[in-house]
């Protein structure tokens, strides 16, 4: 049993996980708590920042209590670091209370501001500065939305802060401070100087004094206040170190700290990334600062990942009564269906698409459906579509930066699927290593805490020492590679073939909703 531990705290969209890690990266104890989210109207998603804090307190108390059950005292905790949901923005007044509900990364209310601001400032210049193509996800456009649509809230907001900055303030007091890898997803950081972009701030009419102070990964942000120690069970004056965005922390947690591998999180959304020593920006990815403090993460993201599979099974197969046996049956049946799902091809953009098209009016498409297809065909076609989209994005990334990867490191619930693992290996032609680490983001934060505690001389060294073993390695079946290459070439043509039709249907649906709303008011 470990006698000294660090805590990696992952404050994600739906819950907080506080996990105590040993020097070898073994999870010793954990605490968890949910975070509620509201959906007040179409395309709007909000949270109360105080819920982040209460969830954090509950998770930390649970972790400390489990440590105590194992005979590990609070003073054995040597450091803490936070991984957090990215691109979620809190608005706080001069008393540190919310002046407006926090806008969550899923929110799309600022679509008009995306168009107007990018046209006025220049879409290419925004991309060059921030590393992010113009899209509704970065917080950049939410500042503009609040200023235009909620002027009183804009006036009453003293600080605009990310999740980490908010939690660090609650833990340690003092000024608002955050890690660079939490700041950069806000969309207003100059990615080459790693500082708030003065041109963007000027265009937003936003003073830098209203933003957190940026610190490098592994920097000491503060120490736990005695009152917080009493509330959580943490030792007073425990050092809290700068970690950051959950995506970058997940990459660190899988030890994707060198350029020969890509991590891929087969979760609700599918997120994949590679490390690069140099700054590159391209529509095929969004560029993030790397968690180890050197270089960048080139990241692609498919919003509708495993969500699509769960949605299909829940809505059309199990009718709200899905369990493991349903997925096992579909997996077995789908494994016997030929590549291409007997003529089915899916476009998995059920929630719009980020890279490489950056089109929020894109929608899902099932092409080739006939009466001879069953539920297992659609199940397989969904997995094929998600896989092909990721292979396409990664290959485009490799070509653009002249950097070839040798293998994937897979995490997330989808990595438990033998069908999905083999499909990714076969379609990419690269081995797929499955990480034993179930909570890669919390482990990444734990690695940064371990560096802060002085266990290792660098964050990279901590990652190499603490990353879990790859107990499953799936090799590609070369006999089917040509079939997947042919299917990928067809898939690449699908978006362009249906783009205008999708746009027309989105516009038509919006018009009908407005007509129905008007009719309801008149009635």
Annotate the PLM regions.
Residues 1-100, 128, 156, 229-230, ...:
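N-terminal glycine/serine-rich phosphate-binding loop of ATP-dependent small-molecule kinases
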Residues 73-76, 210, 387, 404:
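Short loop/turn motifs at secondary-structure junctions
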């Amino acid at each position: 049993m470990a006698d000294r531990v660090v805590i990696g705290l992952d404050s994600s969209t739906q819950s907080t996980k506080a996990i105590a890690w040993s020097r070898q990266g073994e999870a010793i104890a954990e605490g968890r708590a949910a975070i509620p989210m509201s959906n007040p109207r179409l395309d709007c998603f909000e949270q109360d920042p105080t819920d982040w804090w209460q969830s954090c307190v509950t998770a930390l108390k649970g972790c400390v209590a489990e440590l105590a059950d194992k005979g590990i005292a609070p003073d054995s905790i040597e450091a803490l670091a936070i991984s957090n949901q990215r691109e979620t923005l809190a608005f706080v007044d001069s008393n540190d209370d919310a002046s407006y509900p926090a806008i969550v990364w899923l929110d799309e209310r600022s679509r008009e501001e995306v168009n107007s601001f990018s046209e006025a400032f220049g879409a290419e210049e925004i991309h060059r500065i921030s590393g992010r193509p113009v899209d509704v996800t970065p917080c950049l456009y939410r500042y503009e939305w609040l200023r235009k649509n909620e002027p009183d809230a804009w006036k009453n907001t003293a600080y605009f802060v990310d999740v980490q900055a908010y939690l660090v303030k609650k833990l340690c007091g003092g000024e608002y401070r955050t890690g660079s890898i939490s700041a950069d997803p806000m969309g207003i950081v100059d990615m080459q100087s790693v500082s708030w972009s003065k041109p963007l701030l000027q265009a937003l009419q936003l003073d830098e004094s209203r933003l957190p102070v940026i610190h490098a990964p592994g920097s000491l942000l503060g120490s736990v206040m005695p009152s917080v120690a009493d509330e959580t069970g943490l030792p007073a004056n425990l050092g809290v170190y700068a970690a950051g965005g959950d995506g970058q922390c997940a990459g660190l947690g899988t030890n994707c700290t060198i350029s020969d591998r890509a991590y891929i999180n087969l979760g609700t959304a599918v997120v994949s990334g590679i490390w690069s020593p140099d700054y590159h920006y391209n529509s095929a990815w969004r560029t993030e600062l790397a968690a180890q403090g050197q270089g960048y993460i080139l990241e692609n993201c498919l919003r509708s990942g495993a969500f699509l599979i769960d949605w299909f099974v829940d809505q059309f197969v199990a009718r709200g009564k899905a369990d493991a046996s349903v997925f096992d049956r579909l997996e077995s049946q789908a494994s016997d269906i030929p590549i291409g799902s007997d003529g089915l091809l899916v476009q998995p953009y059920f929630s719009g698409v980020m890279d490489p098209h950056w089109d929020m009016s894109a929608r899902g498409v099932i092409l080739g459906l006939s009466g001879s297809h069953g539920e297992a065909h659609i199940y397989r076609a969904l997995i094929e579509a998600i896989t092909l989209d990721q292979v396409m994005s990664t290959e485009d990334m490799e070509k653009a930066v002249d950097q070839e990867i040798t293998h994937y490191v897979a995490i997330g619930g989808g990595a438990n699927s033998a069908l999905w693992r083999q499909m990714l290996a076969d379609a990419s032609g690269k081995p797929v290593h499955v990480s034993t680490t179930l909570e890669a983001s919390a482990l990444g934060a734990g690695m940064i805490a371990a560096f802060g505690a002085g266990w290792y001389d660098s964050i990279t060294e901590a990652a190499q020492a603490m990353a879990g073993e790859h107990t499953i390695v799936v090799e590609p079946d070369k006999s089917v590679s040509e079939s997947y290459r042919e299917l990928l070439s067809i898939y690449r043509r699908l978006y362009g073939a249906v783009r205008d039709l999708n746009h027309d249907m989105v516009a038509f649906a919006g018009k009908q909703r407005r007509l129905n709303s008007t009719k309801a008011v008149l009635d």
